Amino acid sequence: MRTLPQSLCSSAVVAAMLCVLPLTLQAQGPAPTQTPTQTVALTATIRDPAIVPTDRLSVPWWAQRHQAILDSLPSHADTELLLIGDSITNNYDKALPPNEDFQPIWQQYYAPRKALNLGFSGDTTANVLWRLDHGEVDGLHPKAAIVLIGTNNTGFFHETAEETETGIDAVVKDIEHHLPETKILLLGILPTRLPSKDLNFDVNSYLGSHYAGGEDPHVTYMDISVIFYQGGSLNDSIFYDPYLNPPRASLHPNTLGQRMMASAIESTVARLVGDTPIKPLPVSLPASPQP
């Protein structure tokens, strides 16, 4: 007989949804070894999409990026830092028209730490879980991992705050399973003008109460939302979405916003990695785009 591991029941949300009535399976002979997310997936229902490891292999660029990361792992055996997330993390690899080039930020803050970018545009917690369980961190021993995930759960897949919270909890547990010596810097979902902004606030409130108290010694939680506000309002000038044609709701930091974000977390990253903080370059805020 098998039940959901107690380690996963430490999450209040997982406990409420999954651990009150433990899953019971009839097992013949020794049970196969399972990752935390594989075990959680056995209990998941259609109401729990954020914790079911899900691939996007039908999307050509996604499958190619995943394979490229697997192929590159031997050359990243000495990486000190992982960045795990969605398009906001993926953007460090990109130069976006008309004038967004994120590579200088990567070269300043992360290349010296031999960092590996595990950001995939459009990913949810479910996709991150699948990637973790399908080799993307195999053989690695990073000192720290920066995790920023969840905005696609609420913003584009219309998952609830509770589902997204459970998904983020599952990502944390899965990283701890695969990389037990790695320290995790968990970032709150960044602010946005999408209708999901209130859900994101609820998610961040949960993450702050759940992780900020030091209950999980592997996790440091930071909510850096304040840097994206000016005069009490979201500063659209540091997102690139309003400058697209047609304009879109602010979601992705532009080059300036990304640099501000890297600067805001730098002292914590340096502490987790065990090196000297990198001095930020001065920045000046442009005027907000006109509607």
Feature roles, as predicted:
Residues Q108-A115, T124:
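Active-site machinery of serine-nucleophile hydrolases
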Residues M1-I84, I88-Q107, R271-P291:
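N-terminal secretory targeting modules
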Residues R193-P291:
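Catalytic His-Asp segment of secreted/periplasmic serine-dependent ester chemistry enzymes
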Residues E80-G85, K114-G119, K143-I149, K183-G188, ...:
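Structural recognition of the beta-strand scaffold that forms the well-ordered cores
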Residues L83, D123, N127, E163-A170, ...:
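Extracytoplasmic/secreted proteins, especially bacterial periplasmic and envelope-associated proteins
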Residues N90, K94-P104, T125-D169, D174, ...:
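Oxyanion-hole/transition-state-stabilizing segment in secreted/luminal serine hydrolases
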